[in-house]
Each structure stands twice: as structure tokens, then as C-alpha cells.
Amino acid sequence: MDPCSVGVQLRTTHDCHKTFYTRHTGFKTLKELSSNDMLLLQLRTGMTLSGNNTICLHHVKIYIERFEELQKSCCDPFNIHKKLAKKNLHVIDLDDATFLSAKFGRQLVPGWKLCPKCTQIINGSVDVDSDDRQRRKPESDGRTAKALRSLQFTNPGKQTEFAPESGKREKRKLTKNASASSDRQIIPAKSKVYDSQGLLIFSGMDLCDCLDEDCLGCFYACPTCGSTKCGAECRCDRKWLYEQIEIEGGEIIHNKHAGKAYGLLSPCHPYDILQK
């Protein structure tokens, strides 16, 4: 079955028609979506879309129906987290995304989440009480129409444009110190861990750099391949993998597949790792 327009534009055609979240396969044209779903799709993908474009049922689940559920950590709009914050998260709705994006001059996407600390910063920086927030919320239809009109002259672009110098890739980037040698290993220059599609060569798995096997992508879109599964560096033809990562709260997540690749890996000096 051919890939959908969304998969082609995002360069994630290998994900089209997966049955992880739906038992059915097939397409929808974007004109079949409601105006609100069409708007959310544009904001969440950063794509310029038309009614004749198609979206497979898998991508409908990922970007529309289950997008909020799949956001597992704070989007960290102020670049304050050294590790991923995953507790007590608050969902950014369409109204808040529009309001806060205009207030702070950076693109916040409906469905992203904020931790209590970032929420406190917003509440402290934006002098708006609950009544004001209610007054600024127009009727649902008017809200959608206004946001759709704004897309006629501006588009948020790819999610990487939200914070090119930071983003989740930087949050998950391993600290450049002596401990880095235990966090990842480097393969010799002529060997690769990942193929040209970003899949693990020894297993064919499309493993996110967060090391969660069920994750469908939790990073900002990679500027090289467009995947949301690439961490600090694009996975395509990459010559190293993460052996473990540390998340907010000090929890260590180990790569269950590192052992399978152990025969491919060779020891390296920590200096080589720091040069990455």
C-alpha cells in the first residue's frame, strides 16, 4: 500500500499503515477531517496541507486522536530542565497554545505538556487570572476559524524551529563528562549500528533514542531525516547507540538491545566520545 501524504512529507513512510494503535489500514483525505482536526494536524506536524492530501489511519492516531497521550514529558519551553520532566504534566490546549505562542514569541503546539515548574513560570510571567483566561477564549467555532485564518499567512514550520539551539534533543544529550563512556559506545568508522533509514542493523527495529520500545517518537523532528525518534544526532547511518539514559528523578533506562550489538562494538577512548 502506498504511503500517505503526511508520511511522505515527514519522511516517515516506514510508519504508514502500522497497526500498533489501530487494527485497520487505509487512507483519509484531509477534506474528510473536521476543521479542528485539520488545524491540529497542521500545527502538530508543521506541514502545509491541502484537502486532497491523504493521511493513513496510523498517522490519524498519532497526530490527532492520541497525540496528547503520547506526549510523555514536559516540552520545556524555557530550556530549564537538565533531565526530562514526566510527572504532574498539564496539557496545552489550542487556546493556551495560541495565547502563549504570541506572548512568548515561540511556537507551542496543542497537545504538548508542561510540568508544574514551567506552569509556575508562565503564571508568574503572564499576569492573567482565571477570569481573564476565560474571557480571552472565544467560542469553539470562532477560535478554530481565527486560527485557520492565521495559517493563511504564517505556518509554524517544522517543530525543530521552535528551539533550534535546544529542544528535547539537548535535554537527552548525555552530559559531556567522564560518565559519558558508560552511556554510549562508538563503533569503528567503517561500521554502523543504524542503516540509512535509521533502523538498527542487527534487528531492524525502529527504536527511539529515549529507549522506550513502544515510543513512536518524543523528540522534536530531526532536521536531517525528519524523524521524531532521533535524539542528539540523526540515527541514519549512525555509528553509535545509547547504552543507557538518565531521566528526571534520577531513573536510569537501559538499552535492552545493547547486548545484541555488543559483538559489533569496539572499545573506544572517552576522548573520542566527547568529540561527538
Curated annotation (Swiss-Prot):
Pfam families, per database record: ARF7EP_C
Quaternary structure and partners: Interacts with ARL14 and MYO1E.
Organism field: Rattus norvegicus (Rat)
Functional description taken from the UniProt entry: Through its interaction with ARL14 and MYO1E, may connect MHC class II-containing cytoplasmic vesicles to the actin network and hence controls the movement of these vesicles along the actin cytoskeleton in dendritic cells.
Protein name, as recorded: ARL14 effector protein
Keyword DNA repair: no
PANTHER family: ARL14 EFFECTOR PROTEIN
Source species taxonomy: Eukaryota, Metazoa, Chordata, Craniata, Vertebrata
Cellular location(s): Cytoplasm
Glycyl lysine isopeptide (Lys-Gly) (interchain with G-Cter in SUMO2) crosslink site(s): 176
Residue numbers bearing the Phosphoserine modification: 182, 266
Keywords, in A-Z order: Cytoplasm, Isopeptide bond, Phosphoprotein, Ubl conjugation
GO CC annotation terms, alphabetical: cytosol; focal adhesion; intracellular membrane-bounded organelle; nucleolus; nucleoplasm; plasma membrane
Annotated stretches, region: Disordered: 159-183
